[in-house]
Amino acid sequence: MDNKVLTQNKKSWDIMADNWFGTTALPAYGCLIPTEDELKLFPSLIGTKVLDIGCGSGHSLKWCGDNGASELWGIDISTRQIENAESYLTKSGYESKLIDTPMEEMGQLPKNYFDVIYSIYALGWTVDLPKTIHNIAASIKQGGILIFSWDHPLMHCVIAQENKLLLEGCNYLTDDFVSFELRGNPVKIQSRKMSTWINTLAEAGFKIEKLVEETSEKVLEKECEFSTNYYAPSRAKKMPLSFIVKASKL
């Protein structure tokens, strides 16, 4: 596990946390992709214990509470995100159990406990995917549901240039780390093949129930100009910007 990457990412997220308050939260899964209202991937949450990996400002946990979850748990590497989530959930009338920890070090969570574990655009920040997925497998009940969304693996391999999408970015065949600036703050993530995600889940005892690689119908139906922006509608018309996985613990 690369502790230097964790330290840098934590520092940057503590700086950025307030600027991301309330963004990319359930029922949304990400940018220009179908929502939970459309996909209906979650089971009934009434009376369930849920865990949010990378809980951010707590808006997805509030959505779970609004839909009947009985226990709201969350972890995040950013101390500031945890502070924001605690404040937001308390003001919203919900008790929560939030832990300031990297997802690679969530071993203190109860075992075989959660009915649903989910991560909305956060799981890809892990610097050790096998360890993180095994941590999740240890905390979720048999038959429990894991749902997560993240950038589609092709996103780092494609660049937009001169009205074309070109396969000239990262090498898809290698799970390399990528350094960049997010809102002016240095961060580092690992680019992973789709097979890396699927095989890691299988090796940890998960069964894939559904893999979503879609663009929102509203985006597909609307005319748009070509753009070089990372999350551009013109790109979303040609390829999925994100993917969503629903898996169950065997």
Q: Predicted regions span which residues?
A:
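Core SAM-dependent methyltransferase catalytic element
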Residues: 204-206, 227-250
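A short glycine-rich, Lys/Arg-flanked "PGG" loop and its adjoining helix->strand segment in the class I
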Residues: 130-145
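Conserved class I S-adenosyl-L-methionine
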Residues: 1-46, 59, 63, 146-176
